[in-house]
Amino acid sequence: MPKAKTHSGASKRFRRTGTGKIVRQKANRRHLFEHKPSTRTRRLDGHTRVSANDTQRVNSLLNG
């Protein structure tokens, strides 16, 4: 049986932490900032955990 391949799109978008949680970046933080409030762009900083409903699906894409 061939080796299972990691979904390349998912590997670029999600990271697994040391404890096994899956984190992602928030959307709407790439461009067109001139009409977005500074408070919104600060809120969209950093990483956040993948919701519990999506964790199993993302895990399968990452060969978890």
UniProtKB/Swiss-Prot annotation:
CC annotations in GO: cytosolic large ribosomal subunit
InterPro entries per the UniProt record, alphabetical: Ribosomal_bL35, Ribosomal_bL35-like, Ribosomal_bL35_CS, Ribosomal_bL35_sf
Record carries keyword Magnesium: no
Transcription is among the record's keywords: no
Family matches, as Pfam families: Ribosomal_L35p
Domain of life of the native organism: Bacteria
One Gene Ontology term from the biological process aspect of the record: translation
Compositional bias of kind Basic and acidic residues: 34-48
Composition bias type Polar residues, residue spans: 50-64
Gene3D superfamilies documented for this protein: 4.10.410.60
Span list, region Disordered: 1-22, 34-64
Keywords (A to Z) from UniProt: Ribonucleoprotein, Ribosomal protein
Single GO molecular function: structural constituent of ribosome
PANTHER family reported in the protein's UniProt record: 54S RIBOSOMAL PROTEIN BL35M, LARGE RIBOSOMAL SUBUNIT PROTEIN BL35M
Protein family per UniProt: Belongs to the bacterial ribosomal protein bL35 family.
HAMAP family on file: Ribosomal_bL35
Protein name: Large ribosomal subunit protein bL35
Taxonomic lineage: Bacteria, Bacillati, Actinomycetota, Actinomycetes, Mycobacteriales
Gene that this polypeptide is encoded by: rpmI
